[in-house]
Amino acid sequence: MILSITFQLDPISNNSTSLSNSIDNRSSINVTALQMQQGSKTYNLDQNSSYKTVFLAICQLFGIKESSAQDYCLQLESSKKYLNWPPQSDESKTKHIVKQLYESGETALVLQLNPTYRSSKWVKALNDSETNEKDIMFHLKYKLQENEFAESFIEQNGMEGILRMVTNGKGNAQTYSLASLRACLEYVSAMEIITKTPHLVKQLFSLVDSNVVGVCRGALELLFVLCDFRKEEGFKSVHLAAKGTAVAQGKKPYLNVIKLLDSGDLETKINAFTLLNVLLSNCPTDEKVGKLCKKWGELGLDDKLRSLTSIQQQEFQIQLEIYEETSGVNLRTKASRLEAICNRLKSKLTEYEAQQPLIAILKEELKLAQQLIKEASTDRVFLSSHPMQRYLGPTIQSYPADLSFLKTTAAERDKINEFEKKILAINEQLRQETKLSEELKNQVLANKKQFDSTIAELNEENQRLTQVEVKFKLQQSISPSQDSSNNQKASSSSSNTSTLNDSDIQSIQSSLKEATLEIERLKLAIEEKMPPNEAQQIFSQSLITTAAFTPTSPDISNDGQPISGGGAPPPSPSPPPPISGGGAPPPPPPPPPPPSGGGAPPPPPPPPPSGGKKAGAPGAPPTGPAAIQPNKPVINPSSKMKPLYWKRIILPPSNRNESIWDQVLEPTFDSKDFENLFCAKKKAVDSSLSTNPSSTTGKEGEKVKLVSLVDIKKSNSIAFMLAKIPTAEGLKKAIDTVDNSILGKEIIKTLITNVPTEQDYQLIKGSEIHESKLDKPERWILEIYGFPMMKERLVAWLFQLEYQEMYNNIIQILEKLQNAIKDTKSSDSLKKILGIVLVLGNYMNGGSGRGQADGFTLEILDSLATSKDVENKTSLLDYVSKISMEKYPKTMNVAQELDSLKLVQLSISDMSTDINDLEKQFNISKNNCKKVLEANIPSSSKFQSTIGSFLEKTEIDIKNLKENQKNIVDSFIQLVEFFGYPKSYATTASCQQFFNSIYSFSLLFSKQCQKIEKEREALAKASGDNGAVQNKKIAGGADPLAALANAIKLGQTGLRKRPGPENSSGGSQLNLNK
């Protein structure tokens, strides 16, 4: 095949000295004047050649060396499509280019500098002070219409040079620069870069103050398009630019924009007003909206707008309506607003009627094309091409002579489908492996906790044995002497006993050391994340036995028999309990398949036993009185369908409250496709995974060598506490003055558990040991004992320190529940999804007692993912997600809309328990404070004034808290009734289970929708032309920015309405425009 190649250089202005198209510049890229005059050249293409070979050969035709060939690329002359862009050096990825070129029949090619090289020269020209700025900007606007060039230009920070020329330029140079900036901002990448570069947005915002009307008007348009396209990020960028400009000028933010409403140019007024509306629409919070409206009202915005309500321009009237709804400010009377809406609808109706003749012609053309396709699909020898001939000329300039490539394309498409199926199978296997690894990780964490508890018990036993040893030796040292004959015999017996006790204790300590080392080895295996089979082998080789930890009393001999009256040794520790595998009981078995000879359908499976029901799971409301009959028609599928075991809800025709089932939409769907997928057939049962128990590790405790007369645990606790508290006198003073800087919450908790008791005091006094020989805990008890009302004051003080945290926790729990109730009731996406499930379920249950349902209970949502089609591949959840993505694409984000539901962690009874516990501690502290007051302690005046005022305020808070809880509980009961449940169920329902059921379904639904979306994107990417740059523009059409700006002015981009009572009844009519 003979190719015709034309060499083309970038047509840059001849007036630009740095980018002149002189002979000298052309020679620098190895192109002589003679070669430029020769025009195009021809090349004989061999379809077996590689692309690299063909490309280098073409470059040599024009005298371009191989070292400089990387700066060039080939382009189809007809479609302006690059053959290898972005450039691929791997020949395996470019070998198809020659084949496609040969099969397409394209013979005209263009050789030119690649987009990256050309864009770098333009960026350099912008930064060159000697260039002719006006000519550069005039030509740059047209160069930016090429997608590949524009993307490279934006990536090399070319917009910064354009903005500098817009700011500093004058006259036509400034106008051309603004037009080039508009051409850049048509691309998504430019929007992202300028949003993340605050000084660029600030430069753009400063153009609002320009004296040139066109520059000011264009800057306003770019600002509101940027803000609307980038949403919250755009708002933050523009808002910071407005504040920065105002600080630099010493004025208030947005004053310059509001003053433009007095401009004599109507388009400038509309652009300024639109910018303000877009800023309000993209505010992150309603509170911010209110603050902005208040500040703008103080600057005179509302008064200006009231004076401009007579402007009849359509864009201005629409912006007025948007501002009234967003800000809640009534600028016109209700009659005026309705009249404006009516006029706009009349104009739209007139426009619609004018389009009807054209629509009728297009319908006829469509029927003709469909008939031609139908005829072409049949086996015919002759087919008339005249009906479609007029469409082929304008769209296709040249026709391929050989159509054999269609067979190759079909074969490649089949291979792609096979690869996609394999990829899906691999992804499913990866998901199962990830799930298994998570379960094994949870097992390791649980076993590690069990190890730690075992070691804690071993340490405690070690301390007890050591204490027994010390006490025994002390008793031996202070025992009274006897007569000489008895003394000798007793001495011999004592020596044997002492030796026996020392050896036993050494044996115990040795066993403990060996056990600790073994446990450390097992703990190391867990921390190293060994595979389960190796870890299990290590656990089975563990040397830890119960015999190694059997404590030996000082009164037990070597053969295990008690010496005197001793009790039996303590039992060995019991094995650790198995890990509980919570979860619901298994679902009931599916019904048996129908008999081969037909007949009546099998009965539904028996209901689960009462004991196997999940606690708090939504129960089934009664189906209604016998007098209530279904309102929906009976559905009789052509094939026997798999049943969907829901519990239907039949709404009474009258005398009832509003229900969510009155608001759901039941969309249409392909019943034949649905029947093919979900007709009656057996389905497979998944197997569950098993868990393996394991062990834990710990550290060997240290020996306690001090002698203590009080309980060992209390003695140790006091010893640790003494290092953190002041002396006894300082402690008494801190309690009298309620000094939080000396005693913190944790220290007060320890003090309460270690307050000296009468028993401790008498034990120390009765020992008749001198105070100098007592340990620190015993001496502290003697010093602090007798301090009046110590425990009562500490308990009240601790409640004061813990109260705010407890109160805030309860408030947060109530707020989470309140938000969950609000989001669930107001979610439009949830209503649409439930409508799809309802219509599919009624179809599946057609002709049975479960059909003709007005609604269903929510527990059926959990089984949608497990209800498979006849081939056990597609689940009912997949089918629901597919229909939802086709009809309501925005429902994909339902999990984000219901994100507050996952925060509900407690039931209503748990919240009541928390409030009752708070009230109980309050009453205890109140009684303790009363006891301190009645005791008339001279040094407790500060305590009474501090704690007394705190308790008075707390009593009011708890009362308000209980009222708030009652209101939220009533709201939850109303929500449960809103979903069709009876009031008897609503009073006993668990809000945690109720919301978790909805949220878990929405999460699965959103994940499935995202999977569908990714598959569509991958398919679209795979079906696109190889090497083509994606046209990532902000909108379609010849001028995307102007199209998006016009849509924003007409309110067609979904500017939000501020919810609240200020929205008038005409809000629903306003939606007709959007």
From Swiss-Prot:
The keyword Coiled coil applies. Residues 481-503 have a biased composition (Low complexity). The keyword Coiled coil applies. Residues 34-423 form the GBD/FH3 domain. Residues 549-561, 1062-1074 have a biased composition (Polar residues). Residues 476-507, 549-639, 1053-1074 are annotated as: Disordered. Keywords: Actin-binding, Coiled coil. Residues 631-1031 form the FH2 domain. Residues 502-530, 914-971 form a coiled coil. SMART domains: FH2. InterPro entries: ARM-like (IPR011989), ARM-type_fold (IPR016024), FH2_Formin (IPR015425), FH2_Formin_sf (IPR042201), FH3_FHOD1-3-like (IPR056771), GBD/FH3_dom (IPR014768). It comes from the Eukaryota. Residues 597-623 form the FH1 domain. GO terms for cellular component: cytoplasm; cytoskeleton; macropinocytic cup cytoskeleton; phagocytic cup. Residues 1037-1073 form the DAD domain. DRFs are regulated by intramolecular GBD-DAD binding where Rho-GTP activates the DRFs by disrupting the GBD-DAD interaction. Formins play an important role in the nucleation of actin and the formation of linear actin filaments. Interacts (via GBD/FH3 domain) with activated Rho-GTPases. Belongs to the formin homology family. Diaphanous subfamily. PANTHER family: FORMIN HOMOLOGY 2 DOMAIN CONTAINING, ISOFORM I, FORMIN-G. This is Formin-G. It comes from Dictyostelium discoideum. The lineage of its organism: Eukaryota, Amoebozoa, Evosea, Eumycetozoa, Dictyostelia. The gene is forG.
